[in-house]
Amino acid sequence: MRRLLFTIAFVALCGCGVRATLAEDVTVIHAARLLDVKAGRLISPAVVVVKGERIEGVGAAAAPSGARTIELGDVTVLPGLIDCHTHLMGDIQWDEYGTTLLTKSQAYRALEGAAHARRMLHAGFTTVSDEGNEGSGYADVALRDAINAGLIEGPRLQVATRAIAALGQYQPFGVSPDLPDFPRGAQMVSGTDSVRRAVREQIANGADLIKVYADWDYPTLTVEELSVAVEEAHKAKRRVAAHATTVSGIRNALAAGADSIVHGWDADRQTLELMQQKGVWLVPTVGLSESRLAQADSAEERARCTKQLARTRAMMALAREVGVRIGSGYDAIEASAHGANAREIAALVHHGLSTLEAIQAATLHAAEMIGWSDRVGAVEPGKYADIIAVSGNPLEDVARLQQVRFVIKGGTVVKTPVP
């Protein structure tokens, strides 16, 4: 027994020594330019010192002699991108939603999520707020934990698990009343006690944040129900993201104390001013609508997408004018959308943001929105070494972010430039 304990202790000490040695490894990244997302300017040349998982220093003076180097050449390095609203478990067409829930196991959907997560990481998204797993139980918790354990590649994840919607007010619709146990895309609630139980259950099972559907074409959850969700989430130091498109739905979410509004398409000036006063974030999700317009195969679909984009463009002009804080989120729910999330950054520019503002919405400001500004969102000492590289100057051509050439996450290179 004593020999066994000695062996275990010896192995543990050796293991600690190996980890300590790895943590002391220093790498110096050289590139033509660094985008300082705080100052909004390029620094040339770029020198970033990485020690273990973290950024040790920035600038030539910080580079120690004899360190391992990565020479990236004529590229611009910048912080890893952040998507503030995705559905990684989503490989769903709306007209096949019920069929998907019936035919795909949660294990299979977790594997789909793993594939989508890897695709996003290689596209330069090193952090993701995944806001609703569309009926896959707690598979997103397993995905997050597997990434954190190093079992699979993927971004740093915050997950909202099942999301919460009013009874009968989320997909799939049109299910026979004879099938009360038919799987749903969100956890259905009715009444404040039901809401409280759902929030507590989701947090107990690993939710990093709570997602609520404040409306669906019209307000669904009441202010009282939303307030209970916010109360329970905030007690557990979780933020609340509210899906809301209507003025009434947005105002209900604001009255309840939600931390962010997802979509917000019909918000008027007064509502946006209230958001600004309360410091509530807006994630307008405009990029996927642009993509759907481009892919529309009928006059009816093109008209619908065109109308929605016009609404969104008007809302965005007001939001920018009154100073609402904006985070970038692509709302990817279809397989083809995962990894194409940088389209959202370009779409924000199409909707009136400057290129710097759009990039900040996917880096510096996104990190603040999700509560991780102490660890990601900028290339500066102390933050995780989550760094990407693109050709050219993204301040002049934001589409460069759709062609990421190099990705390092937590000091580990996951994508290298192809010669």
Q: What feature does the model see in each segment?
A:
Residues F6-G17:
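Bacterial N-terminal signal peptides
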Residues L34, A39-L78, T99-T100:
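Histidine-rich, glycine-flanked metal-binding segment
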Residues V75-L151, E224, S248, N252-A256:
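Metal-associated gating/positioning segment near the N- to mid-region
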Residues I92-D95, D140, T220, I250-A256, ...:
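Histidine/acidic-residue-rich catalytic or RNA/ligand-binding cores of hydrolases
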Residues G98-L111, G174-R197:
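Active-site mouth loops of central-metabolism enzymes
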Residues T100-L101, K235-K237, Q308-P394:
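His/Asp/Glu-enriched, well-ordered alpha-helical/loop segment
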Residues E112-Y138, G154-R162, N205-D217, R239, ...:
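Divalent metal-dependent hydrolysis catalytic cores, especially in the metallo-beta-lactamase
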